[in-house]
């Protein structure tokens, strides 16, 4: 990646990738801030899922095998007494549109999707509803918010020009503030 090669100073990445980058670079790439909290939801075309336990015996279509969505789903299931390997079937799709297509075609009734895709999906599939907010489910079992995205920086870039980094972070914070309050 360009960040590791030193061609970029910062990047917004999934939280699990940040951990990998930190480890692979021996701390040369580190997290500067969290930029995305819980964006994952279990949606259902039906009314059977009202708790994590209700997923037992069900098929869940989702994306993110080997990434944050898989880890979140498996952890929340396990902590609620649902074995992700034997109590449910998890079918991984390459992207959210593929998962939605399966729900639209009636091949699946339950999917785990990220926002803003959930909102779009609900307008496309009559009867589709948010059954579980995975951020809430994560918080119930961990006591912390679900971090899904972060801003990472090259440590040497920050150390070489701390004023530029501080100015960047001020601008970044102002951008977040504007997005949250002015739209």
What do the PLM-derived regions correspond to, one by one?
Residues 1-93, 107-115, 122, 127-134, ...:
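Short, glycine-/small- and polar/acidic-enriched structural segments
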